[in-house]
Amino acid sequence: MLEKVLKRKNALRAKRKLRVRGKIFGTAQKPRVSLFRSNRYLYAQAINDESGLTLASVDGKKLGLGNNKEEAKKIAASFAASLQEAGIKEVVFDRNGYLYHGVVASFADSLRENGIGL
């Protein structure tokens, strides 16, 4: 029973991911911020889809921060600093199929608070 529920949950996330990725595209001036949420950590990277390059990234594991709302704010603050260092002020947010709720929403709100336009 649990396997069936998890398969359905993952399939729905994959559908959402494809639907969202079909509509957004990152450029050098306005890169795509892709967020990945594991069970323990949070990862984000700014991607220029035109050239396929990662412009900036942050790793919650390397920062010693986990995967909850308060730590997502700290990770986003660190990421915003690296984006500003690279001269990026505007981004396109790719929630990567995750619902815009909890950790994902907290990360996005913290990016906005730190001066990055979404």
Curated annotation (Swiss-Prot):
GO terms for molecular function: 5S rRNA binding; structural constituent of ribosome. GO terms for biological process: translation. Pfam families: Ribosomal_L18p. InterPro entries: Ribosomal_uL18_bac-type, Ribosomal_uL18_bac/euk. GO terms for cellular component: cytosolic large ribosomal subunit. Gene3D superfamilies: 3.30.420.100. The keyword Ribonucleoprotein applies. Keywords: Ribonucleoprotein, Ribosomal protein, RNA-binding, rRNA-binding. The keyword Zinc does not apply. Part of the 50S ribosomal subunit; part of the 5S rRNA/L5/L18/L25 subcomplex. Contacts the 5S and 23S rRNAs. This is one of the proteins that bind and probably mediate the attachment of the 5S RNA into the large ribosomal subunit, where it forms part of the central protuberance. NCBIfam families: L18_bact. Belongs to the universal ribosomal protein uL18 family. This is Large ribosomal subunit protein uL18.
